[in-house]
């Protein structure tokens, strides 16, 4: 059901983009918008992981790294990938005091995970395993591709809306579908609608990744502790400069890296940490009654995406 919801939201976002093209240029504008959407998504499909890793200065690491904590991080990601039935991803570290992590890549065979130096320094080993299991859950669910496509289309809608606002008046009202009022409405409402859809997709995928990540690691309580520590640090700790410069990538991180974090609202990239922790605590109690299994997660594992289980 969660995958169906994501598909419907993505289809709606694409329709909004094509509709914006129609409002600006009629049938020709609609066709151009459709071609642009396909082109942008193809580019994102092949290059998004490289762009994001380069943007954050991610450095690939392996078991020969001189720091014991980094070697443990590499070993744990490799172990978690095996448990999840995934190929070994590229394992990277980003030099940032803010504790955070993300995953990227178009599919499990081309995936990469990144952890900040701040995260490796703040959390204990079980908590780091919980965080990286969450990121591998995103890889398993192909969320990295979904969110890349979503961000690309949402950004294009905003660009089209700005174009309509500044240049839409150059055409006669009779030639412009919707007229001047329609163009103004497009410029105001389209970016808001696109943002709402983008945020709804992102939040639903975070809940799902928490659930499957807890299954991969066999310890939902460790992930809950990690989220609480990261959130507490983020409220008063170092600013993620690169994320502030590129807010469109905020949804990639396990915790919203931006300084203007809010509650679990329509305009938030992530669910409220409190809600995520409560769901994980319930799941952790359930896991504890069965014992820590540490078993592999079946391919295509699915479930409800919210804190209600």
Swiss-Prot record:
It is found in: Cell inner membrane. Residues 289-309 are annotated as: Disordered. GO terms for cellular component: plasma membrane. It holds the Pfam family Peptidase_M48. The gene is htpX. It comes from Caulobacter sp. (strain K31). Binds 1 zinc ion per subunit. InterPro entries: HtpX_protease, Pept_M48_protease_HtpX, Peptidase_M48. Zn(2+) binds at residues 134, 138, 206. Disulfide bonds: none annotated. The keyword Nuclease does not apply. One of its GO terms (molecular function) is zinc ion binding. Belongs to the peptidase M48B family. PANTHER family: PROTEASE HTPX. Its EC number is 3.4.24.-. It comes from the Bacteria. This is Protease HtpX homolog. Keywords: Cell inner membrane, Cell membrane, Hydrolase, Membrane, Metal-binding, Metalloprotease, Protease, Transmembrane, Transmembrane helix, Zinc.
